[in-house]
């Protein structure tokens, strides 16, 4: 459902009383940053149950909007697993936006953990095409987040048999994050969406949003920040693009299984390429080319990320395969994307400064 009416919340770290005042004001107030986010936007998807599907990618889903190549879409997203963990971590319900409560209260099928905006139908997109998603703008819908671990979860399941949660306060003016109950730590805010993907082939059915795959999905790649572009292969007509799983910050690996889960807004620009093909996703930042490897085996994920960069250098830069392989050995930086989603991720980053 598309509408031009939005909630916007100014942010404060001045305590519960201030948070209550700002939550009330959020019904009509608009921050300068979100005003910028609305500029040159073709479609807007405010946070609502109608614009969310919870925890899956599926080619049989009805799209919430149809766009053309070159259109921009503004959207608002609820953090993974909804509001319950925020409550358990000590965030007052008075700080929740009415739209957040509305989404949580609606009866809906929850296959996985991530409320995803969409799907977005892209006119003209066909199987074998490439979808380019430009991350134009990413910001905070609320100035708090949560992180923690489940019993026996994450990278060290035997070390931490219990569970723990921590709330985080986000200073949206200065771009810093503090961990409640822990003094002397300040984390740089680096918001990004952990899950961006298209529908899998119709015969594949419904895919849980937890693990990434050929449809992309839950990459949890902390380098896909504002200003980055993601390229994905299309598997069904219209592509059926979905996005969600907002993170305020994350380390390489996401070792507990969660980043700082946060509610974000974003603006994307979608470009359809009929003259390109891809087997696996790629990305590009202003400074780097990014290849990706996804596999339950970390070694195989690393091989895939390397192989995909070699393929990029051969196909896009015109290099001989052997030379491309050598260049990867001396200049490609492999990073662990995440270790905790079943299908592990490794991404390779190659500096654009190498090319004159």
Locate the predicted segments by residue:
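N-terminal secretory signal peptides that target proteins for export/translocation
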Residues: 1-17
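Conserved mixed alpha/beta catalytic, RNA-binding, or beta-rich assembly cores of soluble enzyme
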Residues: 193, 202-213, 222, 228-296
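Bacterial N-terminal signal peptides
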Residues: 19-31
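Boundary at the C-terminal end of the N-terminal hydrophobic targeting segment
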Residues: 32-37
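Short, basic/aromatic beta-hairpin or loop at an interaction surface
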Residues: 39-53, 94-111, 198-210
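Alpha/propeptide regions of enzymes that mature by internal proteolysis
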Residues: 41-42, 46-52, 60-74, 79, ...
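Intrinsically disordered, low-complexity linker/loop segments enriched in Gly/Pro
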Residues: 114-115, 137-224
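Short, Lys/Arg- and Gly-enriched loop/turn segments at beta-strand edges
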Residues: 80-92, 138-148, 238-248, 338-339
């Amino acid at each position: 459902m598309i509408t031009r009416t939005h909630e916007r919340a100014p942010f404060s770290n001045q305590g519960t009383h201030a948070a209550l005042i700002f939550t009330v004001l959020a019904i009509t107030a608009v921050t300068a940053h979100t005003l910028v986010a609305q500029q040159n936007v073709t479609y807007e998807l405010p946070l609502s149950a109608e614009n969310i599907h919870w925890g899956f990618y599926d080619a049989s889903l009805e799209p919430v909007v149809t766009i053309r190549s070159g259109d921009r879409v503004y959207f608002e997203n609820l953090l993974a697993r909804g509001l319950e963990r925020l409550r358990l971590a000590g965030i007052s319900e008075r700080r929740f936006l009415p739209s957040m409560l509305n989404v949580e209260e609606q009866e809906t099928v929850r296959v996985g953990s991530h409320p995803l905006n969409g799907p977005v139908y892209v006119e003209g997109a066909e199987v074998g095409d490439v979808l380019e998603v430009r991350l134009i703008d990413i910001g905070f819908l609320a100035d708090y987040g949560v992180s923690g671990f489940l019993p026996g979860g994450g990278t060290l399941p035997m070390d931490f048999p219990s569970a723990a949660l921590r709330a985080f306060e986000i200073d949206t003016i200065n771009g810093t994050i503090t961990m409640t109950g822990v003094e002397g730590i300040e984390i740089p805010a680096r918001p990004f969406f952990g899950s961006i993907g298209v529908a899998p082939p119709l015969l594949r059915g419904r895919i849980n949003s937890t693990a990434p795959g050929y449809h992309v999905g839950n990459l949890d790649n902390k380098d896909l920040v504002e200003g980055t572009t993601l390229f994905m292969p299309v598997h069904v007509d219209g592509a059926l693009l979905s996005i969600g799983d907002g993170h305020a910050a994350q380390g390489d690996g996401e070792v507990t299984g969660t980043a700082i889960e946060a509610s974000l807004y974003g603006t994307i620009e979608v470009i359809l390429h009929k003259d390109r093909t891809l087997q696996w996703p790629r990305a590009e930042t202003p400074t780097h080319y990014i290849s990706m490897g996804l596999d339950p085996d970390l070694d195989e994920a690393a091989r895939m990320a390397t192989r995909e960069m070699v393929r990029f250098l051969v196909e896009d830069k015109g290099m001989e395969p052997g030379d491309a392989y050598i260049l990867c050995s001396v200049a490609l930086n492999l990073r662990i994307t995440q270790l905790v989603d079943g299908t592990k991720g490794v991404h390779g980053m190659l500096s654009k400064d190498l090319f004159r």
